[in-house]
């Protein structure tokens, strides 16, 4: 009697297909990395405890000792958890348990991204980021290919989506959420162009605000990237707002306002804290803000990284965004010619990635020059020649650099 091919308990032909040799080699490397990481993590944890007990942690950890210790502990816990998952992930690959390996790859991707952020805050930009960066690329590739059933599902969905997109374009609904639960379809194409356009619109809005409110009549370049008219905080903020508010677009405006205010203010606090912790850079401060003649309590609690007034502006901005601007932006996005929309997205993604990486590197070497710790290497010499302190101060006019505020170890 033939086996029921629809029975999920019966492996399909693609599921029993052998894992390629190169992936098996990678699986062994994952296991070895995980096994070797655990004792290294334990040894490093012992060094941290010893330094704290002996009282010489302040010398090693700098002025922001508590923040540095918190980041180190978080990094240790993250490394230990990642090591265990890497071992299980490698074993699953060897055992040909593709679906479970695919699930674990998503967890490892999230952990690796957080690990990269923690490493930047503790050590800045350097060759030590290559390992997690390469691992991230491999994991992203594996997550899409290791499970052939998932790959086939994606291919079928892609072909179906192309037909649906063409039908939607004919009906004027291209880019909309077909389920009706949200306004916009949350795919990479839509979100990237939301990010790109809002990087520019946000910079224009901030420049106008500075010239009319902060310092009337005085122009200041508020750009946040090394090249181009981009302010990424508004780009990422718009993406977060779009993802968070997508299913709220039919809700009560008060709810949209409150969700936007909380999300926007929290994001502003995180970005300000990350930049100050990583590079000693402060781009804005609301410490001087008052509320009914008293110090703004939110500004006090967040170290001046946000305040009640700007939280309300985030709330109003989110409401205007989801109700008025997003529908018009979607129409603008859909003006990109059908045959070139994906190639254009890839090209501009690469441009923004290069710009972003060079921005972080230039900030890192600016920090090291001011701190007197710049290494004598070709990359540092390149940034020192073409993007020296005067250039950085002129390019990032709203930023102040204070190395003592960073938590470099």
Role assignments for model-derived ranges:
Residues 2-409:
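Aromatic-rich, lipid-facing transmembrane alpha helices and their immediate juxtamembrane interface loops
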């Amino acid at each position: 009697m033939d086996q029921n091919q629809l029975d999920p308990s019966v492996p399909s032909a693609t599921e029993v297909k052998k894992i390629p040799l190169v992936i098996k080699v990678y699986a062994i490397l994952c296991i070895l990395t995980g096994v070797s990481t655990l004792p290294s993590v334990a040894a490093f944890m012992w060094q941290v405890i010893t330094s704290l007990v002996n009282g010489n942690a302040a010398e090693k950890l700098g002025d922001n000792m508590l923040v540095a210790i918190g980041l180190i502990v978080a990094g240790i816990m993250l490394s230990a958890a990642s090591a265990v998952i890497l071992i299980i992930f490698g074993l699953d690959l060897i055992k040909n348990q593709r679906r479970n390996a695919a699930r674990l790859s998503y967890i490892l991707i999230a952990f690796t991204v957080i690990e990269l952020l923690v490493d930047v805050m503790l050590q800045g930009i350097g060759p030590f980021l290559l390992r997690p960066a390469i691992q991230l690329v491999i994991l992203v590739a594996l997550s899409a290919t290791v499970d052939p059933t998932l790959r086939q599902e994606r291919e079928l969905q892609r072909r179906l989506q192309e037909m649906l997109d063409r039908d939607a374009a004919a009906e004027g609904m291209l880019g909309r959420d077909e389920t009706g639960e949200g306004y916009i379809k949350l795919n990479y194409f839509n979100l990237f162009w939301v990010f790109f356009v809002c990087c520019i619109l946000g910079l224009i809005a901030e420049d106008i605000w500075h010239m009319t409110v902060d310092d009337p009549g005085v122009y200041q370049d508020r750009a946040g990237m090394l090249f181009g008219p981009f302010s990424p905080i508004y780009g990422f903020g718009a993406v977060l707002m779009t993802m968070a508010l997508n299913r709220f677009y039919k809700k009560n405006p008060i709810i949209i306002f409150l969700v936007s205010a909380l999300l926007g203010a929290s994001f502003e606090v995180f970005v300000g804290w990350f930049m100050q912790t990583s590079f000693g850079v402060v781009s804005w401060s609301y410490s001087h803000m008052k509320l009914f003649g008293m110090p703004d309590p939110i500004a006090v609690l967040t170290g001046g990284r946000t305040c009640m007034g700007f939280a309300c502006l985030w709330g109003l901005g989110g409401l205007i965004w989801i109700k008025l601007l997003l529908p018009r932006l979607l129409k603008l996005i859909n003006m990109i010619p059908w045959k070139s929309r994906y190639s254009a997205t890839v090209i501009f993604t690469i441009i923004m990635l290069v710009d972003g990486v060079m921005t972080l590197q230039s900030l890192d070497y600016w920090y090291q020059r001011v701190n007197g710790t710049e290494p004598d290497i070709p990359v540092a010499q390149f940034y020192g020649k073409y993007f020296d302190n005067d250039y950085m101060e002129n390019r990032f006019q709203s930023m102040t650099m204070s190395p003592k505020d960073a938590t470099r170890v």
